[in-house]
């Protein structure tokens, strides 16, 4: 069994991240789904979709839920649904380095995968010194 991964994001973010990560790393063996939450979405049907996806993804090893913006509607919805799902971790601040890290460690347990995802996301953010290529 493997940890499931659910991306809960604003429209276009999760699907684009999955597409790009798949192009960089290749297909993942992790069960992974994406729920994109429109700003005008009805909350209860969207929460039911999230619950259903979590149940499908959790084959016993848990689910890592990745959200794009802490405190935004997709994150709040994911957090609310995850509260009633044992073995679920919610991690906010989704970026491409975070998702690539998840793709790179498909056999890790939930706690380890969550830590590696957070580390990958954090290490992928840096200020780059500016200098010309020629010196």
Where are these regions (language model features)?
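N-terminal loops that bind phosphate or other acidic moieties
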Residues: 2-135
């Amino acid at each position: 069994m493997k940890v499931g991964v659910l991306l809960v994001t604003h429209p276009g973010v999760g699907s684009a991240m999955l597409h790009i990560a798949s192009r960089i790393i290749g297909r993942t063996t992790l069960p992974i789904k994406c729920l994109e939450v429109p700003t005008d979405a009805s909350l209860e049907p969207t929460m039911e979709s999230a619950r259903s996806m979590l149940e499908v993804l959790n084959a016993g090893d848990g689910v890592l839920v990745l959200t794009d913006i802490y405190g935004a509607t997709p994150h709040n919805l994911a957090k609310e649904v995850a509260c009633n799902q044992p073995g679920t971790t919610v991690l906010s601040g989704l970026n491409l380095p975070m998702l690539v890290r998840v793709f790179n460690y498909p056999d890790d347990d939930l706690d380890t995968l969550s830590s590696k995802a957070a580390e990958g996301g954090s290490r992928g953010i840096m200020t780059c010194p500016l200098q010309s290529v020629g010196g």
